[in-house]
Structures are given as C-alpha cells and as structure tokens.
Amino acid sequence: MKITAIIPARYASTRFEGKALAQIQGKPMVQHVYERTLKASLVSEVIVATDDERIVAAVRAFGGRAEMTSRSHETGTDRLAEVAARLDSDIIVNVQGDEPLIDPAMIDEAISPLAEDSSLLMGTLKTRIKSLHDFLSPNVVKVVTDWEGYALYFSRSPLPNFRDKWNDLKDEAFSSRKLLCFKHVGLYVYRREFLLQFAQMSPTYLEMAEKLEQLRVLENGYRIKVVETDFESIGVDTPGDLDKVLERLKDRG
C-alpha cells in the first residue's frame, strides 16, 4: 500500500506572509514539517504542494520533493487534489504546513484506520478540550462523534451545548474531564479516489455557514472516522504563534 503525505504550503498567507519559509532553529518551517512527517512509519513519501517558486527552491535545497500547483486554488484541499491526481498512491494524507511541531505518531494514528479497513474513505483526529477558553473560541473547531468514532458534526460554536450545565463551565471541569469535549485536529487522511471526488463536490450550506470544508463530506452522506490523540501541536498563523513554537523548542532543550 502506497501512502503519500502532501503538505500544502502557500507563500501569500494573509496573516503571516511567507510563514512556510520562516526560520526555526536555522531551518525553514516547511522543512520541520517535512522531516517530522517523513518519520511517520506508515508514510511512503512526502511531497510539498505549493504555488510559489521560493518554496519549491527551499524544499529542494534540503533534498525534499516539491510540486508546483495552480495559483487559483481557494483551499488547501484543492491544491492537495491537484497533486494527488498525478500520483498512483492508495492513501493521501493532508499534513498542515504550519505545524512544525507535529508528532509523527499523530500521523500514524490518523492513517491506521484507513490502512486497516478498506471501506473507510476519510479520517481525521480529535483531542480533548482542556479549557473554557478553547471550548468557547470560534477559532477552535469542535467535533462530536458517535459511539463508533464517526463524526456527527463539526462546529466553531460550543459543541455539545450543555443546556443545563452552563454554571459548570469552568476550566476545572475540562481539565478534570468532568465535561468531555473535543477539538478537531486538522490532519486529514483520504482514499485517493475519494479525495478527487471530494474536490469536485460543490460547496454545501453548512460548510459555507461554518467555513469548514469537512462538513461537505457529511452533508453529502459520507462518513469521517475520527481518532482521539493525546498529542498536541501548535499551528503557526501569526508571528506570535511562531514565538510560541520557539519557546516550546527552547524548553525541550
């Protein structure tokens, strides 16, 4: 089974232009993501998908593989699908290019269900919410699943909405696991054929309302397997986030 991890990387990021090439301990951020992804035991190969020659040059400079894509893509999924269409892979993994601390074990956790069950078309990850701030934040995507681990819904709103427990919504309730809530981790695994099909689907009502592409899958009647992980990473959307990454690395020595 051939499993390809693709890292979409744009240069023209609105909040942090050129972040893929931001230096972290002497390496561009995209190199950190690439090298960590390559350490996942289930990944056969890693490719950076980008629309900028500067990123292509940086990736090739450290010996990585990069593919140029159209500049007209509106989403990372579209960029992913363009590269996937050129490949003969069985499974495609979408690894976010702005998570330089991603743990290779997270990637393997997400891949395992599809590698073991050929009926599964798509998978992703979730991790426990540990603070009231994250539970209420629209920037933290929440997910609820059924008893078998399939996604029921993703939302930027508090999910579930504890109708009779708002007085219990304190940090301690989350850290003690009195309230069991999960945030979505944006790492996706697709059967290649399904990814290409997904990219051709029209945007859906709930997807546009929440600005969450994965809802397109649910609205079209398909299932998403969601695996719980204990690993957490830091997404770099701003220079301030980059400072957090540098602090984390400093603490690790």
Curated annotation (Swiss-Prot):
Family named by the database record: Belongs to the KdsB family.
Name of encoding gene: kdsB
Lineage: Bacteria, Pseudomonadati, Thermodesulfobacteriota, Desulfuromonadia, Geobacterales
Example of a GO MF term: 3-deoxy-manno-octulosonate cytidylyltransferase activity
EC identifiers of the protein: 2.7.7.38
InterPro entries reported for this sequence: Cytidylyl_trans (IPR003329), KdsB (IPR004528), Nucleotide-diphossugar_trans (IPR029044)
Any Gene Ontology biological process: lipopolysaccharide biosynthetic process
Catalysed reaction equations from the record: 3-deoxy-alpha-D-manno-oct-2-ulosonate + CTP = CMP-3-deoxy-beta-D-manno-octulosonate + diphosphate
Coiled-coil intervals: none
Domain of life: Bacteria
Entries under Gene3D superfamilies matching the protein: Spore Coat Polysaccharide Biosynthesis Protein SpsA, Chain A (3.90.550.10)
Matches recorded under Pfam families: CTP_transf_3
NCBIfam families in the cross-refs: kdsB, PRK05450.1-3, PRK05450.1-5, PRK13368.1
Gene Ontology CC terms: cytosol
Protein function: Activates KDO (a required 8-carbon sugar) for incorporation into bacterial lipopolysaccharide in Gram-negative bacteria.
Organism: Geotalea daltonii (strain DSM 22248 / JCM 15807 / FRC-32) (Geobacter daltonii)
Compartment(s) of residence: Cytoplasm
Pathway: Nucleotide-sugar biosynthesis; CMP-3-deoxy-D-manno-octulosonate biosynthesis; CMP-3-deoxy-D-manno-octulosonate from 3-deoxy-D-manno-octulosonate and CTP: step 1/1; Bacterial outer membrane biogenesis; lipopolysaccharide biosynthesis
Keywords annotated in UniProt: Cytoplasm, Lipopolysaccharide biosynthesis, Nucleotidyltransferase, Transferase
Protein name: 3-deoxy-manno-octulosonate cytidylyltransferase
Group of enzyme by EC: transferase
